[in-house]
A protein has these predicted regions:
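Conserved beta-strand-loop surface patch within small alpha/beta domains used
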Residues: 1-74, 83-173
Length: 173
């Protein structure tokens, strides 16, 4: 999967007003498949609500309409952790599970501007992570999961290639 180097910087710039208020911001990573390569070409910020440790999209039909009109596939999502470290919370794991069930290559990017490291690219392991999260029936938003390697840093696997090209930014908020 190819990601533009400027993605994090542009996303954090758009998220900055929320980050200063300790509110998470999320975006959708979209692009195209050409010659067996997934390329993220577009960052879409949908209408959303956020708190200090969650963000949720709203009016998803606007997002789907935009992607359909521009022939964009969904390759994952990106969000901030304004004051937390760079990891996938239990809520993030469940959010990402739906993306990875639809597209096994889907990624989740976490930006933690006040921490080091401040940027991570993650995927659920398969096995065991995808099975564990997809069958989890815990009712509380934040909860524990078995102490197993549920997700991994996708940038360490050679799956991600960060290259220099522009990303189209669409703010639907």
């Amino acid at each position: 999967m190819r990601l533009p180097h400027v993605l994090q910087e542009q996303f954090l710039s758009l998220a900055r007003p929320n980050t200063l208020k300790n509110i998470e911001t999320c975006g959708i990573l979209a692009g195209n498949l050409k010659n067996n390569v997934l390329t993220i070409t577009t960052l879409i910020l949908p209408k959303q609500t956020g708190t200090s440790d969650t963000c949720s999209t709203e009016n998803e039909e606007d997002l789907f309409e935009f992607q359909n009109k521009h022939d964009l596939l969904t390759f994952g999502w990106i969000h901030t952790h304004p004051t937390q470290s760079c990891f996938l919370s239990s809520v993030d794991l469940h959010t990402h599970c739906s993306y990875q069930l639809m597209l096994p290559e889907a990624i989740a990017i976490v930006c933690s501007p006040s921490q080091t490291p401040n940027f991570g690219i993650f995927r659920l392991t398969d096995p065991p992570g995808l099975d564990i999260i997809s069958t989890c029936r815990a009712e509380r938003a934040f909860h524990t999961h078995p102490d197993k390697p549920i997700y991994t840093d996708a940038s360490d696997t050679g799956f991600i290639e960060m290259i220099n090209f522009d990303v189209n930014v669409v703010d639907l908020r």
